[in-house]
Amino acid sequence: MPKVGIIYNDIKPVAGRVAIELKDKLTTAGWDVSITSSIGGILGYSNPESPVCHTPIDGLTPPGFDSEMKFAIVLGGDGTVLAASRQVAPCGIPILAINTGHMGFLTETYLNQLPQAIDQAIAGEYEIEERAMLTVKVLRGESVLWEALCLNEMVLHREPLTSMCHFEIAVGRHAPVDIAADGVIVSTPTGSTAYSLSAGGPVVTPGVPALQLVPICPHSLASRALVFPDTEPVNIYPVNIPRLVMVVDGNGGCYIFPEDRVYLERSPYSVKFIRLQPPEFFRILREKLGWGLPHIAKPTSVELP
């Protein structure tokens, strides 16, 4: 009996309703269906009294989800896709993402096209697009305090009502650099259209084997986004602030103290997205972000009073 998974956003009633209907339909068609919510992929939130809420990377995989599963259907928006990616990437399960959210930059199709999408996926009429992920670790000495998979970005920033931060950052074997800013972002190509883009980073197409380091509100005109090979690991040391906040994929994270360091490297895992038509990144940029659209015609003269 073939296996399929369903991961849905349990905050959205429509996603939960469709998930139950889809489970019944696929079970009747002879599939072994495992269903879970994306809450299992949400990283624990810490607090000053308990600064680290640690779940091992392979500890997020839901019951019934394994490498024998043909694919997993994700019902939600981009946040649901990010959470689901952490749940299934260690098992290599492909994701068919159905948008029930807002922008749906990472999703493949919309809810009104669900029946056709399921039929096409069951028939195997699709391509797989792999997206690189990061492994993020918080180390104190050689002990791992916290770790997570990251599809978009890791953000390290100051708390409200605190002063500017200094970060000592070492990329690969290169000499460390000091960056003064409100925070720093380390982003994958997938994350280059998210927080990194808003902070002034470039758009990087998904197939480029690169990472980028983007300062947030830097205190220097010379501190600009840096793109470098994803074979280079990154170590970040806080210098002058008693406590920093780290957030992964806008989802959760932990506090970072002066005795800690944040270590990032390209993960051995990747997210496998089911594409029902050949992936066209520039089309998505146009449709979702308005990139490259023609300028609106403007009048050549203005009549003043």
Curated annotation (Swiss-Prot):
Catalytic activity: NAD(+) + ATP = ADP + NADP(+) + H(+)
Active site per database record: 78
Gene3D superfamilies the record matches: Probable inorganic polyphosphate/atp-NAD kinase, domain 1, Probable inorganic polyphosphate/atp-NAD kinase, domain 2
One example of a Gene Ontology biological process annotation: NAD metabolic process
Entry keyword Ribonucleoprotein: no
Keyword NAD recorded: yes
Enzyme class: transferase
InterPro entries the record matches: ATP-NAD_kinase_N, ATP-NAD_kinase_PpnK-typ_C, NAD/diacylglycerol_kinase_sf, NADK
Enzyme Commission number(s): 2.7.1.23
Cofactor list: a divalent metal cation
Keywords: ATP-binding, Cytoplasm, Kinase, NAD, NADP, Nucleotide-binding, Transferase
GO CC aspect terms: cytoplasm
Residues engaged in binding NAD(+): 78-79, 152-153, 182, 193-198, 251
Gene Ontology molecular-function annotations: ATP binding; metal ion binding; NAD binding; NAD+ kinase activity
Compartmental location: Cytoplasm
Role played: Involved in the regulation of the intracellular balance of NAD and NADP, and is a key enzyme in the biosynthesis of NADP. Catalyzes specifically the phosphorylation on 2'-hydroxyl of the adenosine moiety of NAD to yield NADP.
NCBIfam families: PRK02649.1
Family from the record: Belongs to the NAD kinase family.
Name this polypeptide is given: NAD kinase 2
